[in-house]
């Protein structure tokens, strides 16, 4: 919009992403990173982006979903990140990082392998903060593995990593909730599902699932029906949309 409507052709797309992050941090009260803004600015057809947020170095990983589609399921649970526990999770991770830095020279939790984290985790005094940090470390390693899976066109492995990611987001980072968990758990029980997890910051919003093409229609019906059957409990109706990937 800055380029098209106001003629700011000299501004790079990465700078525009940084401006978006600045606006979220300073005007919307959300202490977010740059992932969403970077994906919007630098997205490329049929590719995922592998981004190092510490220095904004990135590479594209091919997304070849032959015989499968991406299905987005909306929980219809609205949330504002400024009013959610999003900022609290960020603060918990920052405190955990400061505790680890007393015993190990690192700049971010993402620098740690799982083994390195297990060796220093007792430096984090609070068990809740320890869980938050564990998620950050293990999720980072899952991301590295996911890129390798995409490059190898190993969609089954990618799906396994999606599932493990949701479990960690549910149990260690605790940002899912009954609506997202219901959608994901119903997806896991559907034929043809390769993987499913919440997407975004959590506390509502959507799930993303990889589903075999021939099973998409049944998936949408089954997950929607199961979610509606829980309506008295979750009070929402599911909407699903599938992508043109095949």
Which residue ranges define each predicted feature?
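Fold-level recognition of mixed alpha/beta catalytic cores in primary-metabolism enzymes, strongest
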Residues: 1-72
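Short, small-residue alpha-helix embedded
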Residues: 1-5, 204-211
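Conserved phosphate/anionic-ligand binding catalytic regions in large, soluble enzymes, centered on
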Residues: 32-40, 197-206
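C-terminal nucleotide
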Residues: 42, 47-195, 210-233
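Glycine-centered loop/turn positions within well-structured domains
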Residues: 47, 205, 240
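Positively charged, low-complexity/disordered segments
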Residues: 235-246
